[in-house]
Regions:
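Membrane-interfacial helix-loop-helix
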Residues: 1-22, 50-132, 136-139, 168-189, ...
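Short amphipathic helix-loop junctions that connect adjacent transmembrane helices
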Residues: 10, 40-48
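Alpha-helical transmembrane segments of multipass membrane proteins
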Residues: 22, 29, 42, 129-133, ...
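Transmembrane alpha-helix interface/packing and boundary motifs in multi-pass membrane proteins
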Residues: 22-40, 120
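Hydrophobic alpha-helical transmembrane bundles that constitute the permease/transmembrane domains
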Residues: 125-129, 149, 153-156
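Amphipathic cytosolic juxtamembrane alpha-helices at the membrane-cytosol interface
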Residues: 141-146
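Transmembrane alpha-helical segments of integral membrane proteins
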Residues: 158-169
Length: 208
């Protein structure tokens, strides 16, 4: 699974350059499991070949990360009672998550939100989903944006530098991320399920 996605990502970036980096990094931060561990190192490799500029790549990746994160934050902020919490109340026991645990996580985020928002940007997989609890806890959006930008800047700069340094061996990072195939597959399954749910809901409304 990861190989197919990596192949598509590299072709996309090779064709469109900076716009492709922006789109991919935005999606990754907006709950779509597009691995930045592929996007940014490959962009770094292109920097080493003279096709892209290092700091422009880092800035584009960081801004895209912020944009996508704000989208996920808004989903958590505005949709918590309408969708997420209701879902957990009803079905949480089937995925080993209770409503009380969600409430506890929110309180923890309220107390240490800045640290979590920053540190989570340096963690694979977690960084894709951390914006939701930030929205749940109604973390100050300006603080969230600042710490997200700061953490994302470090992450994108590090991955770009790794790709630049490794050169043609940039994809060596890929062998360490096969373990996350299950998260990628689960992400696409969830998206497909949401799409079908919306379609069915629209059909029911039109019939009523």
């Amino acid at each position: 699974m990861i190989e197919a996605i990596a192949h598509w990502i590299t072709n996309y970036i090779s064709t469109l350059g900076y716009p492709a980096i922006f789109v991919l990094m935005t999606l990754e931060s907006a709950l779509i499991p597009i691995p930045s561990e592929v996007t940014m190192p490959f962009a770094g490799f292109l920097v080493s070949q003279g096709y892209l500029n290092f700091w422009v790549v880092v800035l584009v990746g960081t801004l895209a990360n912020l944009v996508g994160s704000l989208g996920a934050y808004a989903l958590g902020y505005w949709g918590q009672e309408k969708f997420v919490k209701k879902f957990i109340k009803k079905y949480g026991k089937y995925v080993l998550v209770t409503y009380d645990e969600v409430e506890t996580a929110e309180k923890w985020f309220r107390k240490r939100g800045e640290l979590i928002a920053f540190a989570s940007r340096l963690l694979p997989v977690v960084r894709t989903f951390i914006s939701l609890p930030a929205g749940f806890s109604e973390m100050n959006v300006f603080k969230f944006s600042f710490y997200t930008f700061l953490g994302a800047f470090i992450w994108t700069a590090l991955l770009t530098w790794v790709g630049f340094t490794l050169g043609e061996r940039w994809d060596i990072l890929g062998i360490y991320f096969h373990k996350f195939d299950v998260f990628i597959i689960a992400g696409f399954v969830i998206l497909a399920a949401l799409y079908v749910y919306r379609k069915v809901k629209k059909i029911k409304k039109s019939n009523d």
